[in-house]
Amino acid sequence: MLSRRLAILLLLAAAPALAQPATLSGFADEGVFHLYMNEDRLGSIKFRWQADGSFESESTISMAGQSVTIVMTIAPDREGRFARIESKSPQGTVVTVREGNVARRTFKEKTETVTIKPDARLFGNYAPPLMSQAVRLYDRAKGGKQAFPLLIIPGVMMEASLEFKDKIERTVAGRDIEFLRFVYGVPGVDITVWVDSEGKLYFADVPAQRAAFVRDGYEALRQVPETDPLLSPAKYEIKLERGVGVPMRDGVRLATDIYRPEAEGKFPVILVRTPYKKEMAELQARFYTRRGYAFAVQDCRGRFGSAGVWQPFMREPEDGYDTIEWLAGQPWSTGKVGMIGGSYVGWVQWWAASRRPPHLVTIIPNVAPPDPLYNVPYEYGVFFMTGGIWWADVLETQATADLSGVALSKVLEKKYKKLLAPLPVIELDKAVLGKENPYWREWIRHPPHDRYWTPANFLDRLKDVRIPVFHQSGWFDGDGIGSKLNYLRMASHGHPNQKLVLGPWGHTDTAGRRIGDRDFGPQAIIDLQRDYLRWFDYWLKGVENGIAKEPLVAIFVMGSNQWLRGNVYPLPVTRFEKWHLAEGGKLTSEIPPAGAPPDRYTYDPADPTPDPRFYEETEEEEKTVRSAEDKKKEREAYHEKVTRERRDILVYATEPLAKPLTFAGPVSATLYASSSARDTDWFVRLLEVEKDGKIFPLAMGKVRARYRRSMKKPELLKRGRVYEYQLDLWQTGITIPAGHRLRVEVASASFPMFSRNLNTGGHNEMETRHVPAQQVIHHGRQYPSHVLLPVIPETELKR
């Protein structure tokens, strides 16, 4: 018995110590950091870090007449490792408590656990001094890029890196100081940090985000003279007129903030028209005004400070025209007007341009949709239900005007699968918004072929819109079809100076390098703000900065992580290849033989096919304590779980590719299908499947069958007849490596993102009666269903 006890004790002694985060003790610092965006101070962080490892900070961010304060405290254990982190903000209090290598994060009565990796460092978005912890643990003797686990407060484990860059001496506050500079690699962004010999942080620069943290008294570290001769320098002070009432043709006045250089003379004008509160654009306005532009920010009709009734889409063409011409006629204006902005703020540019105001010189519509029939609120006849009601909720709660994020967080917390399940769809505004919403109901009462939409459709008006346009979007932009359709329509009319930039980004006007767990490298981050300024400098000021001599088109290829450039889109080297749906769930570049049996499934609106990408925890699941790792695995496995368990999703896949396949540009699909219904929907997804089975979505298209020929003249189906359907799968750019598979999925619903087709031929959003549909997908030589890929020859890629 004694020997057995001794053996157990020896085993315990030999076991490795429980994995612990890195210590915070043995270092002390306190002071104030200031947060800058471009030249503007956005906030301050007051902090105190004590030698026992305790840390406290108070961060205050101020913008648009609002201030938000975030208070954080870190309490250490006896070894100086964090034991408890508490973060208080207007959204609530998050508490992270560690026991050994497991931390429990609690927010709004929801708790999840996080496994802390050995020697994990801490990082806080508004606690820059914490970066000193990683710097002090850096092995200078070893050098190079050193990886380490990072706990991003309040409790997300990531991998980060730190690399010594150089030493630099600067004179600050009357004394010479030698700084060590490191590149701190946080997932998706690199931060250049300046520290002293003890590891104390003085300056943290985030070039990709135009942001910087600088210690109070050391502002000289970020005051680097503008040396780019191709850009207008930031040399002007700013004067601001708030709430100027710009008159419209019907007498309504729209509230407009006008920023102007504090100087004599006339200046070109940049206009932003927004439904999201004009004050929220003040940082952008100040950036351009310092560089010699008058900048006007206007609340759209019926929004915030502007008079009139808010009705999305409908009055924007005339209001945009009238505002442009009013600005051009002001005594401080050169008469040249440009526009910029993303999403709806990009949309209003197209509406204004379609009316050809004489003084509109150029536009930069970032991530802008096309006509409302091809994206929001309809996409080729299919009603974008979640997108439409979510946007209405954001507008009605004025969530975009709330700097604290409280209003938006309430919108995002809603459980859409449950809320959007009842019929009819038109009544869902009551469930989500708590009341009837006039424009939600207008969208539904007027289907795509209704003349109601004529004032909002601009694509057919672009023939005579001969202005230079800077189109910008991303492969994962939820409005990305706009950059495709808008660019292609302008190009089809032969309009010159159509610049197009498509990167591995989402719905944003800035560049990033990550989507989910995929990192596309530093090549993906380009300085778009610099390019926008150069564009305006050339077209509004006549500055010969070379932008007109550069290739007009730049598209990013994921996987090979490089840019391809040319002057037209698709690129001239593009070779369109058909990849065919075939018997047995195969996807092949060869035309399948004739006589293959079709594939069949039943689509039942009573149990609508779920969107495999719409993962949402139920309220009961949220109350269950689970690990963040398990939740992540469940989210990642959800797509495959849905396609495996459902019988109403057809899957076609290639064999593992023998060699890499690169395609970049517009994607489409052709389906030959029949249905027992008078009307139904078709959805096609394109995906990459990694060696381990993980799915990476690339593109999706959809069409409501009655609109297969025309958006203006719907035609119901004849039951059982085979029809050809053309589906627009938007666009993407990627190299699929050898060993991975290409996959196509076909379904007839994508709930709750899009409203279900009831299969009756009636009004799908105003009726409740529904019937199942027997769906048949044909393939083979007679009915060659396929996806069309814009293949790029391997020789065009950089080695």
Predicted regions and their residues:
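Solvent-exposed helix/loop surface patches that form functional interfaces
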Residues: 26-28, 42, 91-179, 198, ...
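N-terminal mature ectodomain segment of secretory-pathway/periplasmic proteins
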Residues: 36-109, 199, 204, 363
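Accessory cap/linker subdomain of secreted extracellular hydrolases
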Residues: 146-148, 290, 351-464
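N-terminal cap/lid segment of alpha/beta-hydrolase-fold proteins
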Residues: 228-265, 653-659
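Cap/lid segment of the alpha/beta-hydrolase catalytic domain
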Residues: 261-329, 378, 511-520, 644, ...
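Short beta-strand/loop motif that positions the catalytic acidic residue
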Residues: 465, 471-473
